[in-house]
Every structure is written in C-alpha cells, then in structure tokens.
Amino acid sequence: MATIYYEKDADLKILKGKKIAIIGYGSQGMAQSQSLKDSGLDVVVGLRKGGASWEQAKKDGMKVATIEEAAQQADYIQMLIPDELQGKVYHEQIEPYMKKGKILGFSHGFNIHYGMIKPGKDIDVVMIAPKSPGHLVRRMYQQGAGVPALVAIQQDASKKALQYALAYAAGIGCTRAGVLATTFKEETETDLFGEQVDLCGGCTEMVKASFETLVNAGYQPEIAYFETLHELKLIVDLMYEGGMAAMWDSVSDTAQYGGMTRGRRIINEQSRMEMWRTLEEIQDGRFAREWVLENMAGRPHFNALTQQDAEHPIEIVGKELRSMMPWLKQKK
C-alpha cells in the first residue's frame, strides 16, 4: 500500500523565508503560484518577458520576472512549462543559477527520469504532482479543501527534501486531501502509459473505430456519434464517482451483460500484447527519444496526425450535434 501524507505531516513554516519561483503560468503554474501566495509564501513567476502570460500574471497580482531573474532569486524552483521545453530552458536559463542548497521541483518526472535534465548532486530534486487540472487545484484550495497529489524525491542533498516537498504540497492545498509517495520513475512511466493506452490514445481510437464501424454498416452518423462518443461521458462519470462496480449497478442488465461478454472480445490477447509493447517503449526510453526527435524535426508526424484527427467525420457531425446542446454553450 502507498504511503500517504496529510496536513499533520507537513510544516509550511519550513518554506517561510524562502523564495519560490514558478516557471510557467499555464493551468498548473497559475493555480500553484496563486495558492502558494495565498498561503503566505514568497512567490515569483518566471516567464518570457512581454508574452501574454506575463501580462496575465501581473494582472492576477503576482510578482513577475524573467526566467533567469526568477531562477537567480529563488531558493525553490518549480518547473511548470511543457515537457518538451523544459530541457532547453533549464540548461540555458536556470542551470547557471542552481547553487548548492537550492530545490528543483517538478509536477511530472519526464525530464528527470529520461535524463534531459541532470541537476548537480548538491541540490534537492523533488516532485509534487497534483492529480487534477490546475483550475480544480485552485478551486479546491479556495474552498478550503484540496486535490490528491503525488510526492517523489529524486535527490535529497539537504536531508530535508521530503519536508520541503510536503510543505509545498500543503501550500497548494494537497495535504488536505492526501499526498501519495511514489518515485520519478513510477510517476513518469505510469503517467505516459495511462495517456497512451487508455486516457488519450486507446480511448480516442476506440471511439473512432466504433463510429466508423456503425457508419460503414449504414447507420446514420448522428446516431453513431451519440452511441459511441456522446454517451461515453455518462459512463466515465459513473466510474469516476463510484468505480466500475457502481457503473455496472447503474446501467441496464442488458448493457452490463453485453459489455462484460463482448468487451472481453474487444480488449483481447492481441490488445494486451500491444499494451505491454507500449509499456516497454516507455520503460526503455524509446518513446522519450522519439518525442525528443519529433520536436527537433519540427513535429511533422505530430502535426500530420493532429490534422488527420481534426478532419475525421466524427468531428464534423459532432460539431453540428453539440450546437444542439445549450448546456455546452453555457460552459464557454
């Protein structure tokens, strides 16, 4: 069973008197920096000067500096820019200021685990990874609650790295919910696997394939959309709220029997072999190297696949059907 840390295990005071630099002001950067500030900590946001995020952070009342200035000032530097940018930004704008005793933090272990960033041995390297999007991190903090998070320690030069990381987690509200201990290796490999096999890759390919099957069999695209994509949210919400057993309890017996008997034919031995193959590519670094090279080449494959999915018939019919759903317009 995982070790879980709570409020009683964290001492926010250990970060008082230290300056925290949040590098990036996207979903997580915005949520984490604002919550740390509201927790009474000294926070500066490191950004590219003149960019849209710079003005937004200033408008939100944050102290803003260039990445170099923030890194030079800070005792604790949290990297919250995209994975593919972190290595270059770290080496060019942060590494020169990583002096002994500083803390380097992440919310995803990709660059540390695969060696794109190799910090000196005299600094702490930690991870606090909230298990929710940034807007929910912020909303739960403001409501006096928090979202679960992961904590990992890669280097403990100070012998206080876990204390610093848990204090950071407390500063963004995560110790109110619980912080699970992991490693950079485990977080990185399981996160990538989930994205590729289930959450992003497997799910979208399953939806497209089932939609295509119905349309090619002569069913109306609109009906196929409802049955293969639209209703997916209903099922996922049930699993999210109560687990798979609760989901089965909520659907009809016909749906449960059909799903249990036929679902095992869809996810068959060949599918499981591909899951293992995908995991091996993550574990041995092949996927990481492929992604780095793809970015170096200007993302030709990434852009082609993105365009291909954008032009899929399910996108065309989906846009039309979503225009009939006023509750979606209200969210915008």
Swiss-Prot record:
Co-factor note (free text): Binds 2 magnesium ions per subunit.
Residues of the active site: 108
Domain KARI N-terminal Rossmann: 1-182
Cofactors (names): Mg(2+)
Domain KARI C-terminal knotted: 183-328
This protein's record includes keyword Cell wall biogenesis/degradation: no
Highest taxon above the source species: Archaea
Catalytic activity: (2R)-2,3-dihydroxy-3-methylbutanoate + NADP(+) = (2S)-2-acetolactate + NADPH + H(+); (2R,3R)-2,3-dihydroxy-3-methylpentanoate + NADP(+) = (S)-2-ethyl-2-hydroxy-3-oxobutanoate + NADPH + H(+)
EC number annotated for this UniProt entry: 1.1.1.86
Entry binding sites for substrate: 252
UniProt similarity note: Belongs to the ketol-acid reductoisomerase family.
Function as written in the Swiss-Prot or TrEMBL entry: Involved in the biosynthesis of branched-chain amino acids (BCAA). Catalyzes an alkyl-migration followed by a ketol-acid reduction of (S)-2-acetolactate (S2AL) to yield (R)-2,3-dihydroxy-isovalerate. In the isomerase reaction, S2AL is rearranged via a Mg-dependent methyl migration to produce 3-hydroxy-3-methyl-2-ketobutyrate (HMKB). In the reductase reaction, this 2-ketoacid undergoes a metal-dependent reduction by NADPH to yield (R)-2,3-dihydroxy-isovalerate.
HAMAP family: IlvC
Protein name (Swiss-Prot/TrEMBL): Ketol-acid reductoisomerase (NADP(+))
